[in-house]
Amino acid sequence: MKKTLQIGFYILISLFIFTQSSCQDKTFDDESNSENSGNDSSDEGDDNEETLKEGLTWLPENPDADSELTINFKAPVKSKLYGYTGDVYIHTGVITEGVWAFVPAEWNENIAKCKMTKKDDNCWSISLTPSIREWFASGETAINKLGIVIRSSDGSKKGIEEDSFIEVTDNKYTAFQPAPIIEQTMPAGTVEGINISGGSSVTFAFYDKDKNGNYKDFAYILGDFNNWTLANDGTSQMYRDNSAGCWWITVENLDPAKEYRFQYYTGTKDGDVIRLADAYSEKILDPDNDKYIPESTYPSSEMVYPEKGIGIVSTFKINKDEYSWQNNDFKIKDKDNLLIYELHLRDFTSTSDINGAMSKLDYLVGLGINAIELMPVQEFDGNDSWGYNPCFFFAMDKAYGTKDMYKRFIDECHSRGIAVIFDVVYNHATGAHPFAKLYWDSKNNKTAANNPWFNVDAPHPYSVFHDFNHESELVKTFVKRNLKFLLDEYKIDGFRFDLTKGFTQRQCSESTASDYDDNRIAVLKEYYDAIHEANENAVVILEHFCCDEEEKELANYGLKLWRNGNYAYCQSGMGWSEGSGFESIYTGTNGMRFGGYISFMESHDEERTAFKAKEYGNGDLKTNLANRMKSMAANTAFFLTVPGPKMIWQFGEMGYDVSIEENGRTGRKPLHWEYLNDQYRKKLADTYTMILKLRNAVPQLFSSDATFRWEVSESYWEGCRNISIESIDGKKLFIVGNFTTEEQNSSAKVPIGWGEYYNFISTEQLSDVAGKNTNIDPHDFIIYSNFLMN
């Protein structure tokens, strides 16, 4: 009996050990996500946890679209879901024409249908029943591949970092079988994109010829005009014009008053099929993001997505809605006296759109600026962004408003004497851009080596997304066409080019990217020439930050260069002398052509000076708002009075002291229009207004003919800094500033022989000041003048 009990005890222990080891973790196979990973088990019907391999597995091994499918995931030690105790969900879709279709839930949406059952520690399972097709409700769409991601409930953890895929057999529905290519020359005058020539017909064309001269095996068009139906006939099949490198088709009998939606369908017979929107679309429909745009910003009735669309869809209308411009001949008066307000629509008003910004135009006029630089407004991925992630360059982003709203905003600006400058991003494009999708290395999730527009890897160290090759004639033609379109269609007054240092094909590092590059210079001059062919008065500004030799050559050609004074003005604003010299923002310092620099204290990209003063200020600047705003005003007096174009970042005039890192660097920032109700912040805004209006009313003081002298290096920290300006008609300014924490007696004396002396800001007439030093309070300044403005 004792022996029998011992045997029974050993059997129980063995069973316990076997059960516990069945879901223990083995070495993680990194290859498990490449058509992951199937099942080695000969017992195909047993899905108990005892038989599960690590990683993603499924039963049956060779699933049929009209049968049930069970998907299991066992987290290896290296998986982020290993040891995770919360709910686990499957994010899945049918891979159709290169996109995930019939996805049951958004990434951050947890629904019961997608919740996996926990089988044991680190083991989860889900069954797609009664069949794969019915579970996805995919209708008559052929199912040949599923995309799979196993995630935590908040989406922050993935079981496998890369997307996984399961091949499926579909015996009921088959993918469309394209016909052989028909070669035919495009109609004369046809260009890439949507060719509307009047009447009721439109010719569509898109370029497809890779670096090696190869092209896809077929191309079709789908749209409202053919009921989104693929057919091997003239309603859908596109012709091939190999001499032009294009697929094309003419669609006839269209209603000129109707807006149509369409896509291209192209691919290779033995490879992936993709849907493309037209790269030259002036309006797109985005099924993932349009639904979140408020009705007041863009009417939902104008964003109806087609049932049979997949991914981003293009639209067109033969009889376009014409905007009636009130201002057709606006011109920038003086490009060397631009006073630019850099504005981000999302963070400028509570509505985060064009209409909100339009309601503040009178405020901006009152402030005294004469130009607005809009951060990128061409279609970008998502709705909530700085905009430096462009995907469609000819379409304005709907998150800010309709096409007419953009035009009205520009028209209203022109009515008020304000120029409008678009911030444009041609260094790169996102993977949603048709040029990126057309030649895409899905295995490595990057640009394909045969892509004729993009570099596989950027030659410079500042790459984001997909890097345009600006020495490609295809790229240069595209960019020049887009620049001309924006000037003609929206009547804007110029451009600020983002990251032009990246317009290089020279392999370089952080230490060499700024070196002189004659090819980069040639590209930028070519773009400048194209702009001036369309509008000879347009201003062209570069975010370049290259060597002086290169920047001077570009400035001598007529372009203007961003000049970053943020560090120096943050230092002076905080009351610290080290690194606080202002000399670099003035063209006279290094022989730059007058007006060649657009200098700034702040930009969208830099930390806010008032925040730095609040956080790191010397003495009581951290706690004393009155002194902090005085320090910001002293900065302003020694910035806006320097000749040459200037740029202000939005709300700098209010002493906005929320960090750029608040809610993430590019994240939404809080509004503080109530700042203007505070006496100290209002006084700062008034200082901006006084000097900006001076620059507009007396431009000769800030012209190349005026005499300008200043002492603003670190060596003038003690004893006050000063600026002297005299116009050719005898108007004079003398500015003295104390950036320290102690009262200072200026080392420079007030000039003699002016006749009359005024405190320009207070308008008080002064006596007995000529030839004398000035006592200046901490963080304060005074502007002496021999005149007053009306």
Regions found by a protein language model. Give the residues of each.
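C-terminal beta-strand-rich structural cap/linker in extracellular carbohydrate-active enzymes
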Residues: 769-790
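Contiguous beta-strand segments within globular domains
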Residues: 59-75, 196-203
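Aromatic-rich carbohydrate-binding modules that target alpha-glucans
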Residues: 82-140, 155-163, 205-257, 267-289
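Basic K/R-rich, polyanion-interacting modules in nucleoproteins and related proteins
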Residues: 173-219, 275-336
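Substrate-binding/active-site clefts of carbohydrate-active enzymes
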Residues: 281-285, 289, 321-322, 326-338, ...
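Bacterial Sec-dependent N-terminal signal peptides
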Residues: 16-58
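Active-site-proximal helices and loops of the catalytic beta/alpha 8
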Residues: 378-379, 384-389, 499-601, 638-641, ...
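Short beta-strand elements
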Residues: 158-174
